[in-house]
UniProtKB/Swiss-Prot annotation:
Start and end residues of each stretch annotated as Disordered: 1-27
Protein name, entry field: Proteasome subunit beta
GO biological process: proteasomal protein catabolic process
UniProt keywords, alphabetically: Autocatalytic cleavage, Cytoplasm, Hydrolase, Protease, Proteasome, Threonine protease, Zymogen
Length: 237
């Protein structure tokens, strides 16, 4: 089958439709080698919506294959947008690359349009990148606030995007989900959501070997993102 000639200003029809504008996925190295040798966050990450904003909480542990604790102070939630944050779940390298790519595209959109991208559009972009890119074994949570309200999305490794009032991803999700199912209600304040998120992460660290060593809490409102780390759970309550 013949290939169309490359014409000036014409987009390459063979290009990956899910690629970011600023780079090609072909230029990015996927995590290689034995999966057990890849640094993974293990992880329990939680996102909760309230009328006042979004609360995200994560533990701090990274491990090698879930058997050796390689780092005890990993920040697993990063700001990627003026009023949105994303968690790191899965391989550390893949998650960090994913965050850098998504943040760059969000910044480019804001520069060109003069306004931030909507959170639903940001979630769609994140799903497209997860589906089309070399980001190895990631399953992050995106939480943000825009004119339509507070939003929490889970992004699966195949690019699936699901919005909910609250969600959990990572190796400790079964334990943390139980705490949220028992305590969550629609009228949570931001302070109550913070307390619940921290308690759910703590519950997961009691049983999940991939989670532990403290907690990061991010509060997301229309005014911005605030991220604070605590070496012990008592300090976060």
């Amino acid at each position: 089958m013949s290939k169309f000639p490359d014409l000036p200003g014409m987009k390459n029809l063979d290009a990956n439709p899910y690629e970011p504008e600023l780079a090609s996925f072909d230029d990015m190295d996927a995590d290689a080698g034995d999966g057990d040798a890849v640094a993974k966050t293990g992880t329990t990450t939680i996102g909760i919506t309230t009328d006042g904003g979004v609360v995200i909480a994560t533990d701090m542990r990274a491990s090698l294959g879930g058997r050796f604790v390689s780092n005890k102070s990993v920040q697993k939630v990063e700001q990627i947008h003026p009023s949105a944050a994303l968690t790191l779940v899965g391989s550390v390298g893949g998650a960090q690359s994913f965050i850098r790519t998504l943040r760059s595209e969000s910044d480019l959109y804001e520069v060109r349009r003069g306004e931030p991208m909507s959170i639903s559009a940001l979630a769609t972009l994140a799903g497209n990148f997860a589906r089309g890119g070399p980001f190895f074994a990631i399953n992050p949570i995106l939480g943000g606030v825009d004119e339509e309200g507070s939003h929490v999305y889970s992004i699966d490794p195949a690019g699936g995007v699901m919005e909910d009032d609250y969600t959990v991803t990572g190796s400790g999700m079964q334990v943390a989900h139980g705490k949220l199912e028992d305590r969550y209600h629609d009228d949570l304040s931001m302070e109550e959501a913070e307390e619940l998120a921290v308690e759910a992460v703590y519950a997961a660290t009691e049983r999940d070997t991939g989670s532990g060593n403290g907690v990061y809490v991010a509060t997301v409102t229309g005014d911005g993102v605030d991220i604070t780390g605590y070496d012990d759970f008592e300090g976060a309550r």
